[in-house]
Amino acid sequence: MLLSTQLQYGDDPIRNAESVVAMERAGLDMVWVAEAYSFDAVSLMGYLAARTERVQIGAGILPIYSRTPTLTAMTAAGLDALSQGRFALGLGASGPQVIEGFHGVPYDRPVARTREIIEICRSVWRREKIEHDGLYTIPLPPERGTGLGKPLKLINQPHRADIPIWVAALGEKNVQLTAELAQGWLPHLMVPEQLRAVFGPALDAGTAKRAAGLGPLQITGGGVLAVDEDMFAPARKRARDMFALYIGGMGARGRNFYNTVFARQGYAAEAELVQDLYLDGRKDEAAAALPDDFVDRATLIGPPGFVRERIAAQRAAGITHLHVNPVAEDVPRLLSRVREWIE
């Protein structure tokens, strides 16, 4: 099991980078860099590649709609070269509020687009001349442009032709696609004991089509982490606020994928209540309405013995990357302890 964390997109990027340098020394294996409608993730990942030596750097995630497939592939190849083979491309659909509201492009056919983007990226990394006919047409047909486009291949030799692709997937079809085509899966808001119950059929269907060369599917899981008693209250508040944001406000009513995943884990009534409160502007009440047992099982907050039990539950669910959001006076020291527990 590897140890990973995610940088918050609203934080100062320079301070984020300094924290990663310290966490790398403490044993962190992988850092994910988010991109919502904040600073772009690519700039910080390039900076991290220069500041770090060992830690893997993942895009967590690059929205599939905001870049062309070939630009996504070029960006991944460039970051992988700068980091000397430490980059992982995380892809995700984001949601219509961000894609249409901030980027101004239609949010349509996310699963089909993800499949084509994965295919195009891998073709670019193999330095093939890109010819693709689907939702994306490359080169552009003459009737849609000047008629001067021709198939091209990447100029540079990539550091790797098999840059790992991870997908943030919550819907059944997208999870199935991920299990079929991606090296890794980035689920969210999951109680580990519920992972198979919610996503088992989709994972099995995708795995049945999976190429042997991809190896077993890697999966992240974990949550807010605290083991010191004086940190329990702020850690639980951080977790509740984050859960309320995603379950209640990260998407319009009826199009909130996080709300759906929460409901499918046995919390249908609570999902509706949290969303109603959050969308009504009662964010603190939404956070308080989250069931205690969900907060306990979807985080790593408690005495060392309890946290080690939760890590064991993550491992039993098939989690390969323990994903932590640490709350501590001395974060590197906390990560060093957890590093020992998972080895």
Predicted regions located by residue number:
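Active-site-adjacent structural elements that line small-molecule/cofactor binding pockets in enzymes
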Residues: 1-343
